[in-house]
Every structure is written in structure tokens, then in C-alpha cells.
Amino acid sequence: MATTTSRAAFEAVFPTLAEDLLAHAKKYNLPENAVKWFEQVLNVNVPGGKLNRGLSVPDTGIALLQKPLTDEQFKHLSILGWLTELLQAFFLVSDDMMDSSITRRGQPCWYRHPGVGLIAINDAFMLESGIYVILKKHFRSHPAYVDFLELFHETTWQTELGQLCDLITAPEDKVDLDNFSMEKYMFIVTYKTAYYSFYLPVALALLYLELATPENLQQTHDILIPLGQYFQVQDDYLDAYGDPAVIGKIGTDIQDNKCSWLINQALQRCNTEQRKLLDTAYGRKDSELEAKVKALYKELDLEKVYKEYEEKTVGEIRRKIAAIDESQGLKKEVFEAFLGKIYKRTK
């Protein structure tokens, strides 16, 4: 039996959801040019990414049931998966404006498309609101309807808290490494990434299959939040040490003054001389200064520090997975699949 969802089958669900949203907009007699605009917003920003979060919802359903999904289960879990992708699109459209980013998924960021600009702010709002339009249409009579609503609201709030902390800790135009700390870093990655990327998809599948007991949700939380933290540390490591040809992007964390895992490790380990170098070279739009920071990372042997962190963290996560209580329908396979996808990844 297939233990993962086919990407093509998952992608085939999206056009019907886009149609649902456009039909809903038309109920308000929205002028045709605005309907066309919204259609473009949906098609440019929602599909086309890696779809990891979205695919995780039906994949989790398969792992929980230990058998193929019925057509209805597949459709519903895929819709919930696409709602995580709508949420992601809302965050990314907004985030790219806040960061003045240039490209996203190899294309110009949405706000940089001709004629879009600041209209992208309202477009982001509409992507978020679309989540609740779809939830109502497809899940209004599901026993977990209110739980779905609360989970999306709570996850959105958590992600925004993480984003706030990120934006004020590391503004691109003002470098102050005294602002950085491992505590702030862990807060940012936990709230900005771990909840919506890891906890949300599994919690949605548990709710849909009516397996979301307090114990199951707690166990899910206690494994997936550390897993999400590890994923982000890995991302930060790959930004400096990964191969751009493999990752598909050139790392910019050093020049962007990011409060990353590597700079926090460097700050904990550097001497006075090295700290001076970091203060003058970090967060500057200058590739020679960036190269100096990377050379200092090498001097401090941060690659070894990362490898030790990885083995220790993955060991702890594996122990937690092994200790899962499956008596209420939770399955170890759910978490083994997540770990398998990210352990020692190169992109």
C-alpha cells in the first residue's frame, strides 16, 4: 500500500478550492476585474512550493489509519492540507514585503509583480480569510469544526508572535549583536516555524479522524515542536554550509543580519578579538565581510558544533518517538516519517 500521498493527486484538489473561493467572492457581486485579480493571487501564491506542509496532512492520515484513505477521507484531508498552504501563502506574501525580498520560488515576490505593490497587503488578508470560507463550506458539520477554527486562529497568532520577535530582534538596517541570544532564537524558531510547519498538519489530521485526545495532542506537541526547532537550526546551518546548487538558493542570513543559530553559537564561543570582527562584519551587504564571518565560523569549528547538536537532538527525538503511547490511536510512524524526511537533509 502507498504510505505517502501522490503529489499529483494532492495538486488535483487545488483547482476546486480556488473555484470555491472565487464562487464565494462572486456572491458579493465582486466586479469581474477584481475576481480575475483574486484568481491570480491564488494561482501565483498558493500552489508551486514544495507543499511539504500540505502533503503532511493526508500522509499523517494514512499513517494513523494504517490503511489507504477512502476517497472522501483523501479529499477532506487534502483540503485541510491546502488550508495549511493558504496559511503559508498569507505568511510568505506578507513576510516578503517586510523583508524587502526579491524572489520567492524562483519568481519575483508577489508584491514585485507589475501593478501589485502595496495591494499585496490586502491580497495577503484575503488569502488568510479564504481559510475560513473553505472550512465553513466543507467542515461546518464536522464534530471538530470549532477545533479546526481555534487551531488555525491559534497557529496564526503563534506565528505572528514569532515574526514580531524576529523583526525587532534583527532589523536589517541596525546591527546590534547584543540583541541576540539563544533564548530569543529558540522563541523565534518555535513560534515562527515549528507550530505551523510541524504541529498544525498533524493536529489537523488527528482532529479530522477524531483521534485528537488531549494525550495524543500533547504527545504530538512534545515531539513535533523539538523537531521543528531542529529543522530550523538545520536550515540556518545549510544557509552557510550548504551547496547553493543543491539548496536552490544562495544563503543570505549573514548579510541580512539574521538572528540565526550559527551567529548565536559564534557569540557564545568567540574571544574579544573575534567579537570585534563580528560586530563590524555581520549584517553588512558586503560579500568580503560575509566571507570573513564564514571564515570565523570555520575557526570556531561550528560545523562540528552543529554535527554534535544534530546527533544529540535526533537521539532525544528518537527516544520520545520510541516511548509514544499508541493506546489512543496515535502512531509512531507519523513521527518517523517526519524525522526521516529531515534528518541529514542537504536541501
UniProtKB/Swiss-Prot annotation:
Its cofactor is Mg(2+). Binds 2 Mg(2+) ions per subunit. Pfam families: polyprenyl_synt (PF00348). GO terms for cellular component: cytoplasm. It is an enzyme of class 2 (transferase). Keywords: Lipid biosynthesis, Lipid metabolism, Magnesium, Metal-binding, Steroid biosynthesis, Steroid metabolism, Sterol biosynthesis, Sterol metabolism, Transferase. GO terms for molecular function: (2E,6E)-farnesyl diphosphate synthase activity; dimethylallyltranstransferase activity; metal ion binding. Isopentenyl diphosphate binds at K50, R53, Q88, R105. GO terms for biological process: alcohol biosynthetic process; farnesyl diphosphate biosynthetic process; geranyl diphosphate biosynthetic process; mycotoxin biosynthetic process; sterol biosynthetic process. Mg(2+) 1 binds at D95, D99. Mg(2+) 2 binds at D95, D99. Pathway: Isoprenoid biosynthesis; farnesyl diphosphate biosynthesis; farnesyl diphosphate from geranyl diphosphate and isopentenyl diphosphate: step 1/1; Isoprenoid biosynthesis; geranyl diphosphate biosynthesis; geranyl diphosphate from dimethylallyl diphosphate and isopentenyl diphosphate: step 1/1. Its EC number is 2.5.1.10, 2.5.1.1. Dimethylallyl diphosphate binds at R104, K192, T193, Q232, K249, K258. It catalyses: isopentenyl diphosphate + dimethylallyl diphosphate = (2E)-geranyl diphosphate + diphosphate; isopentenyl diphosphate + (2E)-geranyl diphosphate = (2E,6E)-farnesyl diphosphate + diphosphate. It comes from the Eukaryota. Belongs to the FPP/GGPP synthase family. Farnesyl pyrophosphate synthase; part of the second module of ergosterol biosynthesis pathway that includes the middle steps of the pathway. Erg20 catalyzes the sequential condensation of isopentenyl pyrophosphate with dimethylallyl pyrophosphate, and then with the resultant geranylpyrophosphate to the ultimate product farnesyl pyrophosphate. The second module is carried out in the vacuole and involves the formation of farnesyl diphosphate, which is also an important intermediate in the biosynthesis of ubiquinone, dolichol, heme and prenylated proteins. This is Farnesyl pyrophosphate synthase erg20. The gene is erg20.
